[in-house]
């Protein structure tokens, strides 16, 4: 077992914050405070009139945020899908100059065995971002059917052996006196069920990702946040989003593409293209940004990160 504990290093720190094109007097939202890397950098670029609101589901992130003693900063314990409600309560709807979302699980969450995110460390099988709400992974697995579990593994983990793994997990929980309650216990059941081993990837990688995404409704949260971003942002407000797996990145990419696409003007039509496309809500800023080789070497967990930036017209 690998017991390496990774120091939390904020991925694409400067690139994501630069993507916000910070105005010193602006109002910004860090939707995923985590351990505060992005928030602290944003604050360093704001004047005394600037403002930063951060949200996070994780109680430990909230505790970390409460150590920041800065009148320009405010933390709200909620999911980033609730940003529209937060803005409404603060009278800031349509006034936000930039929203940053870092969709990754933080190193402290992964490395803390008690959180149940890691298949490399033994701990209670929890996986909840907000440990005060909802079912833990163990509680959900104790009641799920083979078909439902297989669907989750296939849909959110793109796991080719989804059915086989689901059968093994549900069968174990039905036959054993004590149901699956530990991370390494689940990881071993998955490993035993998988007929083909990838030497570069632990056999439980995709399943743990899928269960975590489902337990935390991560893609639903992202969908809600994307759909509401346009109403929250001010004109020329920026959206800077870091994703860590293809499902998230696909959603972000499609959202930005769909909302930035105009119509070509048919030949001979007496209308300017700018007039025809004036209601396009977004403009994509640059190409997708990946971590540099140097960043990947310093922080291997950054390897799969993709940053996309867009601006409200």
From Swiss-Prot:
Its main location: cytoplasm. InterPro entries: RsmH, SAM-dep_MeTrfase_MraW_recog, SAM-dependent_MTases_sf. Pfam families: Methyltransf_5. Its EC number is 2.1.1.199. It is found in: Cytoplasm. GO terms for cellular component: cytoplasm. One of its GO terms (biological process) is rRNA base methylation. It is an enzyme of class 2 (transferase). S-adenosyl-L-methionine binds at residues 36-38, 56, 80, 102, 109. Keywords: Cytoplasm, Methyltransferase, rRNA processing, S-adenosyl-L-methionine, Transferase. GO terms for molecular function: rRNA (cytosine-N4-)-methyltransferase activity. It catalyses: cytidine(1402) in 16S rRNA + S-adenosyl-L-methionine = N(4)-methylcytidine(1402) in 16S rRNA + S-adenosyl-L-homocysteine + H(+). Belongs to the methyltransferase superfamily. RsmH family. Specifically methylates the N4 position of cytidine in position 1402 (C1402) of 16S rRNA. HAMAP family: 16SrRNA_methyltr_H. This is Ribosomal RNA small subunit methyltransferase H. It comes from Actinobacillus pleuropneumoniae serotype 5b (strain L20).
């Amino acid at each position: 077992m690998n017991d390496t504990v990774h120091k939390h290093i904020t991925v694409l720190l400067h690139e994501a914050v630069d993507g916000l094109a910070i105005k010193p007097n602006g109002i910004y939202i860090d939707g995923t405070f985590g351990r505060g890397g992005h928030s602290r950098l944003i604050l360093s670029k704001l004047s005394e009139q600037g403002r930063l609101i951060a949200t996070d589901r994780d109680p430990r992130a909230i505790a970390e945020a409460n150590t920041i003693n800065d009148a320009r900063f405010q933390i709200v314990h909620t999911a980033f899908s609730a940003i529209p409600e937060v803005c409404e309560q603060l009278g800031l709807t349509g006034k936000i100059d930039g929203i940053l979302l870092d969709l990754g699980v933080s190193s402290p969450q992964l490395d803390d065995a008690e959180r149940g995110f890691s298949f490399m460390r033994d701990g209670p099988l929890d996986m909840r971002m907000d440990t005060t709400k909802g079912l833990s992974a163990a509680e959900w697995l104790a009641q799920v059917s083979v078909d439902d579990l297989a669907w989750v593994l296939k849909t959110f983990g793109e796991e080719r052996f989804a059915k086989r793994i689901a059968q093994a997990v549900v069968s174990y929980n039905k036959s054993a006196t004590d149901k699956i309650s530990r991370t390494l216990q689940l990881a071993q059941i998955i490993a035993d069920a998988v007929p083909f081993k990838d030497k570069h990837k632990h056999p439980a990688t995709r399943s743990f990702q899928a269960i975590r995404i489902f337990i935390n409704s991560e893609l639903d949260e992202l969908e809600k946040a994307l759909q509401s971003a346009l109403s929250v942002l001010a004109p020329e407000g920026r959206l800077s989003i870091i994703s860590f797996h293809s499902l998230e990145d696909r959603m972000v990419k499609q959202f930005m593409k769909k909302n930035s696409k105009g119509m070509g003007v048919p030949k001979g039509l007496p209308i300017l293209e700018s007039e025809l496309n004036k209601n396009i809500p977004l403009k994509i800023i640059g190409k997708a940004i990946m971590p540099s080789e140097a960043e990947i070497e310093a922080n291997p967990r950054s390897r799969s990160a993709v940053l996309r930036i867009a601006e409200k017209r």
